[in-house]
């Protein structure tokens, strides 16, 4: 434990598994009291067994977001950090996308994010040093991947929201920023198999895939007093994946 976030209470949506779980664990290691949300009772139950403060939440439900944020603030001694991490990323080719799929991903990734930010703002304002960190993606405004046009659109929307929200929240000394993960080793990614993962790693200049804790460390910085003068920005955590020259240039050096 470093004490970087000592005295802080953080809420991580979608924090029962994957990147969100990694973020929650890192924030706790830095001294924060951490509450997480999950959409399914199964994941919530597992996280409770692991000793986390867990709240079941579907971020599409605005009233539920308000209720959960108020519960966290009341039961955990306030709220000073919100990590809007909950999201979905189904792969669907553009030609196969239908309106229901588009509505679903925007309802979760965009409206859901906005719901939790709106719900948390009063408690963050009261804390006197509120921090909001959104888990976005390099597909938001830097690069793209086949099958994720709808996902990339939601992440671009998040970044537009962050920049404008930063202007509105600044008067309350609340900062809002994003982390943009590259290829991060999650259970879903591991399921693709070792050979596929090895090929993915070759596309990263550092020669390896990231881990959820790498995202967590970036979030911890943005949630800390060290980032008090940073707002409306994003940190890319991708091992150099988006660098224009790519690994081929490194091989020639």
Where do the model's predicted regions map?
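Conserved glycine-rich cofactor-binding loop
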Residues: 9, 16-18
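Short, small/polar-rich loop/turn modules that mediate ligand/substrate recognition or access, typified
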Residues: 83, 129, 170, 175, ...
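Substrate-binding pocket helix/loop in short-chain dehydrogenase/reductase
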Residues: 93-94, 101-106, 200
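Active-site helix of classical SDR
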Residues: 117, 154, 162
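Alpha-helical segment proximal to the catalytic Tyr-Lys
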Residues: 122, 167-168, 228
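C-terminal helical subdomain
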Residues: 171, 178, 199-230, 237-239
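Short C-terminal tail/terminal secondary-structure segment
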Residues: 231-253
């Amino acid at each position: 434990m470093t004490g970087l976030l000592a005295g802080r209470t953080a809420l991580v949506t979608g924090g029962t598994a994957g990147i969100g779980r990694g973020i929650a664990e890192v924030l706790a290691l830095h001294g924060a009291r951490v509450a997480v949300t999950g959409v399914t009772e199964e994941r919530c139950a597992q996280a409770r067994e692991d000793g986390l403060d867990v709240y079941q939440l579907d971020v599409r439900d605005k009233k539920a977001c308000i209720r959960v944020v108020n519960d966290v603030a009341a039961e955990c001694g306030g709220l000073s950090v919100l990590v809007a991490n909950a999201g979905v990323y189904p792969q669907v080719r553009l030609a196969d996308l239908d309106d229901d799929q588009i509505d679903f991903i925007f309802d979760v990734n965009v409206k859901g994010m906005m719901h939790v930010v709106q719900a948390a703002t009063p408690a963050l304002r009261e804390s006197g040093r509120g921090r909001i960190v959104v888990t976005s993606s390099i597909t938001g405004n830097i690069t793209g991947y086949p099958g994720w046009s709808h996902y990339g659109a939601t992440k671009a929307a998040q970044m537009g929201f962050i920049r404008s929200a930063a202007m509105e929240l600044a008067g309350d000394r609340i900062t809002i920023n994003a982390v943009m993960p590259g290829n991060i080793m999650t259970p879903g990614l591991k399921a693709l198999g070792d050979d596929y993962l090895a090929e993915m790693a070759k596309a990263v200049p550092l020669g390896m895939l990231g881990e959820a804790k790498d995202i967590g460390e970036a979030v911890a910085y943005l949630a800390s007093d060290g980032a008090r003068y940073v707002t409306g920005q994003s940190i890319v955590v991708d091992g150099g994946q988006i660098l224009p020259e790519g690994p081929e240039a490194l091989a020639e050096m």
